[in-house]
């Protein structure tokens, strides 16, 4: 009997080895993205088809413990283990070994600098990629100089990385342009926003990916990723704002006149609501998260506190217990929107798990002094960039 089991084990091992050899390696047309959030990790795999991504697999796993705070990785070991679990489940679904990943960075110390740069061209020169690269590099250089000078003046010795930039506007012979390539002119200019994050935020993200055998193919910022997913370019002529309310951070971006005009981040987000429930009802973090998720139901919520006593709380009482914290969250988000937009936008999109919180949309509408028909949950425009026959993508949690 033992010999039969041994032979069977060897046969299974050979089959597993054969399956491993047969697994494809991720091709250039396959995109693997990980959203490493404060409460969960969501992974997506898609194939680029005619300028859109066909999403073929999605996996999600929640953190069992608080391994991330305010969008920043605190426990690399735990986050990498969870990310590896998501990656392996996706690999099994798409029968492909995933080697490259796209990620979006968040953090408690996002800082931006706006800069412009211009070039005089000989004659009416054809503008190619090399000229556009020189133009953008010049503006980035000016942004870095201004950023370094400010840090020096404030005796801030922390190391920062330039992690991305967004072009606000191009100019050709004093006229605004959305794209300079293949035009001819004598004078070109670019206006852009450069973004910086502390080195520990970026390095922890790279270390986490390296631990599970992934190369970071691209890194962007969560506010940029959110607005690119939720608001297509043809809508950016309007003055719109997007808030992606996660567990640890609320990522904010604004656009008008066809381009992104600013983005920022607030460290007040869904976890503050969870912590308010913990303190009010003496429950652990996991129980508080479950209670928060059930606020939308009208029936009383039943749970057991840390002392072992069962409690039954009506929805109205629960909403009252988080009212102060919810108001603080809305005021913080509203202040950040007004700061980067110069006023209330014409319309506001809400994304992320926090956008589902009962009453938050209505309270934010009042705080900004907007009409309730001008505030909506994002998701209707995801089809501009991605589609799926297997999954329902119009979920605000899939924004980044």
Predicted region positions:
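Nucleotide/phosphate-binding catalytic cleft detector across ATP-hydrolyzing
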Residues: 1-40, 44-240, 261, 270, ...
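Conserved phosphate-binding/catalytic loops in two-lobed NTP-binding clefts
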Residues: 129, 365-400
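Glycine-rich phosphate-binding loop of actin/hexokinase-like ATP-binding domains
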Residues: 192, 238-276
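Short beta-alpha connecting loops at secondary-structure transitions
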Residues: 261-262, 275, 317, 386-396
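Catalytic P-loop NTP-binding/switch module of NTPases
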Residues: 273, 278-285
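Small-residue helix-packing motif on alpha-helices
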Residues: 288-291
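A general structural motif
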Residues: 325-334
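Glycine-rich phosphate-binding loops at beta-strand->alpha-helix junctions
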Residues: 344-369, 379
């Amino acid at each position: 009997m033992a010999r039969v089991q041994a032979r069977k084990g060897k046969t299974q091992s050979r089959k597993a080895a054969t399956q491993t050899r047969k697994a494809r390696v991720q091709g250039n047309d396959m995109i693997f993205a990980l959203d490493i959030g404060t409460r969960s990790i969501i992974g997506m795999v898609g194939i680029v088809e005619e300028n859109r991504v066909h999403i073929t697999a999605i996996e999600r796993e929640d953190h069992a413990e608080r391994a991330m705070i305010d969008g920043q990785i605190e426990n690399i070991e735990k986050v990498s283990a969870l990310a590896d679990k998501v990656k392996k489940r996706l690999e099994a679904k798409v029968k492909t070994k995933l080697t490259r990943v796209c990620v979006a960075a968040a953090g408690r110390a996002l800082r931006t600098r706006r800069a412009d740069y211009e070039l005089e061209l000989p004659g009416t020169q054809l503008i190619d990629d090399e000229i556009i690269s020189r133009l953008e590099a010049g503006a980035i250089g000016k942004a870095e100089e201004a950023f370094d000078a400010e840090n020096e003046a404030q005796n801030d010795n922390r190391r920062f990385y330039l992690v991305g930039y967004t072009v606000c506007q191009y100019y050709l012979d004093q006229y605004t342009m959305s794209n300079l390539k293949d035009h001819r002119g004598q004078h070109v200019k670019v206006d852009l926003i450069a973004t910086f994050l502390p080195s520990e935020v970026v390095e922890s993200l790279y270390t986490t990916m390296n631990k599970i055998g992934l190369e970071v193919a691209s890194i962007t910022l969560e506010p940029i990723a959110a607005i690119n997913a939720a608001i297509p370019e043809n809508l950016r002529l309007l003055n719109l704002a997007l808030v992606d309310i996660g567990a640890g951070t609320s990522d904010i971006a604004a656009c008008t006149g066809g381009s992104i005009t600013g983005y920022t981040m607030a460290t007040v987000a869904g976890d503050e609501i969870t912590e308010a429930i913990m303190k009010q009802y003496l429950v652990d973090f996991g129980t508080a998260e479950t209670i928060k998720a059930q606020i939308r139901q009208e029936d009383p919520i039943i749970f057991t506190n840390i002392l072992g006593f069962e409690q039954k709380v009506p929805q109205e009482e629960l909403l009252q217990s988080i009212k102060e914290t919810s108001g603080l969250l809305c005021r913080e988000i509203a202040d950040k929107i007004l700061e980067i937009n110069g006023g209330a936008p014409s319309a506001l999109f809400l994304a992320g798990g926090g956008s589902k919180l009962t009453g938050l949309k209505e309270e934010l509408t009042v705080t900004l002094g907007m009409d309730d028909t001008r505030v909506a949950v994002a998701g209707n425009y995801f089809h501009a960039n991605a589609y799926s026959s297997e999954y329902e993508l119009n979920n605000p949690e899939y924004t980044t």
